[in-house]
Amino acid sequence: MRTYVVTLAAAIAATNAAHAASETVIMNAIDANGVGEEIGALLLSDTEAAGLQVQPALVGLPPGDRGFHVHVNPDCGPGTGPNGQPAAGMAAGGHYDPANTGKHLGPYGEGHKGDMPVLSVDASGKATKAVVVPHLTVADVKGRSIVIHAGGDNYSEQHRWAAAARASPAA
């Protein structure tokens, strides 16, 4: 039986456009061996009043709410996890925190900019409900990765690593 960590990451390639209003990011499952099959895409769009809108079109995910973050590095390859063992997606690095706040205060707080609202996955494994991240733009996310974690998100300093191993990038 094949098991893979269900955390997803999308490495977002930089484009030549100086101020792109939208970007489509292909998402792939990842595991401790690297990048796996495509599971869908995210459409990222800047909005004038609200911030970054993220419209998912994803399939094959476990049902429930998932932690959803922008990570520093555009590489979603495997690396060493917090327990010292090989783990999926660790090359993505930590959450995007350009002001070096070191704080996990959620998508509407004054902490790091990597927190996004949770991604809701329906009973059939599809994620199609858009979220808006008020403090991000498409330009902020370019050259980084987006990770969908295996579990929910408590937006705290205490990470639930057992439920937050990473799993999927897109280039």
Regions found by a protein language model. Name each.
Residues 16-171:
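N-terminal leader/targeting pre-sequences
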Residues 1-20:
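Gram-negative bacterial Sec-dependent N-terminal signal peptides
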